[in-house]
Each structure stands twice: as C-alpha cells, then as structure tokens.
Regions:
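Alpha-helical transmembrane segments and their membrane-interface boundaries
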Residues: 1-63, 110-113, 117-119, 127-140, ...
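Structural signal for the N-terminal portions of transmembrane helices
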Residues: 88-130
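Alpha-helical transmembrane segments and their membrane-interface exit regions
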Residues: 69-76, 123-133
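Alpha-helical transmembrane-segment detector that highlights a single hydrophobic TM helix
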Residues: 57-87
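Short, amphipathic, aromatic/basic-enriched membrane-interface segments that mark the entry/exit
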Residues: 29-36, 82-94
C-alpha cells in the first residue's frame, strides 16, 4: 500500500471518527440526525474536499460546494411549528448546527489539519454535552419574557 493510499485512509477515518463522536451524542439525545447521518456528512465533506488536493482544481470551490450542500441539508432538519394560542417554535437548530460543524470537521480532516480536527471535535462535544444542562438551568431560572411556558421546557431531553 503506497503512502498516498494510507494518507487518504487516515484522513477519511479521522473524518468518520470525529463526525461519529458528534453523531453519537445527537443519537443519545434522541435526535433524528444521529450517528450515521453525521458520519456520512463528515465523510462526504472530506471526500469532496480531498479530490482537488491531488490535482490542479481549486480547493476553495469544493469547500464552497460543500457549504452550499450542507446548508440545504441543515435547512431540512429545521422545523418551524405553530402551536396553540399563536405560539411559534423552531426545532432542529442545534442538530443543523452540529451537521454544519461535522461537515467542517470533514473538510479539515481532508486537508490533514489534525489539531483543528481535535480541537473542533472536543469543542463541539463540550458545547453539546456540557452546555445542555447549563441551557436547561438558564431557561428554567431566567426565562425570557416573550417565550411561552410550554416552549421553555422544550430543551429537556426526550424521556424513554
């Protein structure tokens, strides 16, 4: 196996693992975009960005294409609901943001920026895991005046 093959395998594997860690957290939380979705997004982004690295194509165009495609995918994950009494609620923003970050991690892995992958993955997991209870605490103890009570509890994880 040549060095090029090994390097490509390592880069794609790093994209899959980093994306999988984030997807696992989303799966645990009962989100629709979970483990496999995040892994596929990360790998797909890594594949698209790695293609121009081997030739003369402009890598920035590949990055722009991934960003556009991920924007459409994330938009499909966001749901705007109209509730009773004229209340409105938006769901899926965190999942959409985690998909967007996953794509970025895949692109970063494709170019071999290992420190960025590690810091980005750890930072994302800290935000998703550590900030979840902080967000719940803030919503319960410092509610915004224009947010209906029913929507304040929407950050609670689904019960099994």
């Amino acid at each position: 196996m040549t060095g090029d093959w090994l390097e490509t395998i390592v880069r794609m594997t790093v994209a899959i693992v980093a994306s999988g860690l984030i997807g696992w957290d989303r799966q645990r939380g009962g989100q629709v975009a979970g483990l496999r979705t995040h892994m596929l997004v990360g790998l797909g982004a890594a594949l698209v960005v790695s293609i121009p690295l081997g030739g003369t194509a402009d890598t920035s165009r590949a990055v722009q294409g991934v960003a556009t495609g991920i924007g459409f995918l994330c938009a499909g994950d966001i749901l705007h609901q109209h509730g009773q009494g004229g209340t409105e609620r938006v769901k899926g923003l965190t999942s959409a943001a985690s998909l967007w970050v996953t794509a970025a991690l895949g692109m970063v892995a494709a170019v071999g920026a290992w420190r960025h992958v590690v810091i980005g993955t750890i930072g994302t997991l800290l935000i998703l895991i550590v900030m979840r209870p902080v967000e719940r605490f803030l919503i319960r103890n410092h509610p915004l005046p224009d947010v209906p009570e029913a929507d304040r509890r929407s950050t609670d994880p689904p019960t099994a």
